[in-house]
């Protein structure tokens, strides 16, 4: 019997559920470039409502959502402040600089992804022709699976606005942040979502990660900003025709898969707990659905290869990253833990040619 694969590389690997596929097949369609695909319009209205914004724009990818947002906020030659390990700066191909002529100013982040308020204030350039004009602060929530504290988001966004900066949120996994915040506060996840997004002028939300849709992201913000982003999307090749097929999956996910993200968080904690105490491992458990593991003595590649042989997939660069999602269950997590334990119990854990993938995705 073939063992079921436990794919913990990313929450992007999920497949559409049968109900989601049915919603896609039944979706009314039009031509979204002409603006008359009813399912795309319904999705845009729904995510704008959930985030408390005037409008939203459906995009193929989160990278494009972030880039269109930056290009809508900034003029050519402007600068945006961003964490040195933030996705928009490190993992999106340098698009802001290459395609938007926007200069990033990367700033040091602590172990929780926070940029100190002092560093933020000092990085804002004076109004002088020698400097790029600092016009935007970009934050990310969640960051490496960690939820940004509301107190920090409030202080950072207030500081930015006091200096005339707009504030953008890379909210690829903001639904995870909202669900975790709701669990801590005993409140509704969608109410927490609006609390988070209310602090930002714009927010990108990914549908193809924990929510489980096959494709898509949305940029949400003021109507005038979304109109600028629409022009940028066209220029970047993001206009799609009968994209209601994809929007239907995202709309289904918004209506059915938000609350269930809590199950992914429970599985991540189950994984972290199971890996605790293994000699040679240092577990950095997160608030939500991502667990990082540092592997001692340079054995990360060998561990990755061992896991692949046992039908467990992960990614790694410095240590390994495991991401839980709707296609993983408790049995799969327990198998992953047992596989890691077998590796460290074995003497055959030497060098390996397994490729370490750079992530995060």
Sequence positions of predicted segments:
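Conserved PLP-enzyme active-site core in the AAT-like
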Residues: 2-297, 301-328, 336-361
């Amino acid at each position: 019997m073939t063992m079921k694969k436990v794919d913990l590389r990313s929450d992007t690997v999920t497949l559409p559920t049968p109900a989601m596929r049915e919603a896609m097949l039944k979706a009314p369609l039009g031509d979204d470039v002409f603006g008359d695909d009813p399912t795309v319009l319904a999705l845009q209205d729904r995510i704008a409502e959930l985030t408390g914004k005037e409008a939203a724009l459906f995009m193929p990818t989160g990278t494009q959502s972030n880039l269109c947002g930056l290009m809508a906020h900034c003029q050519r030659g402007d600068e945006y402040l961003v964490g040195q390990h933030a996705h928009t700066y490190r993992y999106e191909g340098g698009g802001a600089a290459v395609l938007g002529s926007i200069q990033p100013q990367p700033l040091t982040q602590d172990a929780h992804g926070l940029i100190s308020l002092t560093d933020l204030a000092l990085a804002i350039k004076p109004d002088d022709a020698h400097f790029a004009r600092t016009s935007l602060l970009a934050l990310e929530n969640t960051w490496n699976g960690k939820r940004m504290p509301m107190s920090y988001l409030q202080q950072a966004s207030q500081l930015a606005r006091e200096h005339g900066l707009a504030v953008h949120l890379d909210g690829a996994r903001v639904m995870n942040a909202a669900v975790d915040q709701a669990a801590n506060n005993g409140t509704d996840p969608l109410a927490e979502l609006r609390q988070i997004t209310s602090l930002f002028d714009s927010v990108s939300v990914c549908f193809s990660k924990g929510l489980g849709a096959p494709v898509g992201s949305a940029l949400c913000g003021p109507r005038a900003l979304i109109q600028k982003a629409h022009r940028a999307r066209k220029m970047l090749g993001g206009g799609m025709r009968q994209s209601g097929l994809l929007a239907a999956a995202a709309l289904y996910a918004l209506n059915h898969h938000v609350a269930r993200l809590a199950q992914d968080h429970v599985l991540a904690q189950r994984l972290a707990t199971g890996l605790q105490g293994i000699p040679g491992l240092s577990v950095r458990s997160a608030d939500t659905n991502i667990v990082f593991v540092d592997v001692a003595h340079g054995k990360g590649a060998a561990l990755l290869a061992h896991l692949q042989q046992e039908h467990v997939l992960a990614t790694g660069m410095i240590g390994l990253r495991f991401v839980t999602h709707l296609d993983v269950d408790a049995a799969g997590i327990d198998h992953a833990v047992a596989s890691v334990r077998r590796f460290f119990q074995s003497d055959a854990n030497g060098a390996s040619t397994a490729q370490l993938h750079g992530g995060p995705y």
